């Protein structure tokens, strides 16, 4: 269920004071028995700045030949997502929400120097075994044409939620190890610097321990981006769709492996697992030729 609609424009960056204030308000506010998601639409214009893109791409393993990473518009839309989740009308505290699913689709090449208009909306409530999930969707347009779409699903831990079930993905069949990574202990701070996501569970030992983690964990979107960098061609993407389910945290300093069944093909499934192969951190699906008739990321609903 969603509330009344509001359309707002935010081109200024989200300040640290706004983040702290919104987080505190959320923690002090009691979650209602029947949560109502605000029907909000937030917009901003963003310039694809080459220096910022290069710093992000390098940290995530993209080569210069791959151009603007398909995940970069998600980074540009993150301040809009945070404004929604930190809002006084949002039923859940932003602190403690878990990013459990992300799907992005690019329908045209995106290049540095271009301007994108980003529109982020609140989607619907979704059912998850570990609590109540909800969706936030983003559309990026260039000269009035949609060139990128994204959908992120977040989870509020608690009793099983209501709504349509959060999507899952099958494990890849016949997969082998393609790459091995060891995320450095300072990766969380470095990723926060290039992405704007400074969640303390990724950047501080104390912040991680306060939420039950023995040490900081990698950002899920870094893990997804790192996998995309390894699986996609050494050339800018024209069209692609990448879906990921975040299944368990990656502790910084641990060794993890990327598994897939080469060669990469339409609807190729992949996984990021621990070195021993006993724990799945991320399960994904890559489609380098997405059909225009496939289902786009969901918009707002009631």
Predicted segments with their positions:
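HotDog/MaoC-like acyl-thioester-processing domains
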Residues: 1-37, 79-82, 99-183, 249-252, ...
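Hydrophobic residues on conserved beta-strands that form the core of alpha/beta folds
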Residues: 39, 149, 239-241
């Amino acid at each position: 269920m969603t509330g009344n609609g509001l359309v707002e424009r935010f081109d200024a960056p989200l300040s640290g004071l706004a983040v702290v204030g919104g987080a505190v308000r959320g923690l002090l506010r009691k979650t209602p028995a029947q949560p109502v998601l605000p029907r909000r639409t937030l917009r901003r214009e963003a310039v694809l700045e080459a220096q910022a893109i290069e710093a992000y791409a390098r940290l995530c393993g993209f080569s210069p030949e791959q151009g603007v990473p398909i995940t970069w518009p998600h980074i540009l839309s993150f301040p809009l997502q945070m404004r929604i989740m930190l809002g006084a009308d949002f039923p859940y505290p932003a602190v403690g929400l878990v990013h459990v699913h992300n799907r992005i689709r690019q329908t045209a090449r995106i290049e540095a120097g271009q301007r994108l208009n980003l529109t982020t909306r609140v989607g619907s409530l979704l059912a998850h075994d570990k609590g109540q999930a909800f969706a936030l969707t983003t559309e990026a347009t260039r000269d009035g044409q949609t060139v990128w779409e994204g959908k992120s699903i977040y989870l509020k831990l608690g009793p099983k939620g209501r709504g349509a079930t959060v999507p899952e993905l099958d494990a890849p069949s016949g997969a082998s190890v393609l790459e091995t990574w060891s995320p450095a202990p300072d990766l969380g701070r470095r990723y926060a610097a290039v992405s704007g996501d400074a969640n303390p569970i990724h950047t501080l030992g104390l912040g991680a321990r306060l939420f039950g983690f023995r040490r900081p964990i990698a950002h899920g979107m870094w893990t997804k981006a790192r996998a995309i960098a390894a699986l996609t061609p050494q050339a800018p993407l024209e069209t692609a769709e990448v879906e990921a389910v975040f299944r368990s945290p990656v502790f910084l300093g641990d060794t993890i492996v990327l598994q897939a069944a080469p060669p990469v093909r339409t609807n190729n499934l992949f996984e990021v697992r621990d070195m021993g192969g006993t724990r799945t951190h991320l399960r994904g699906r890559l489609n380098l030729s997405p059909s225009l008739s496939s289902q786009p990321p969901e918009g707002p609903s009631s």
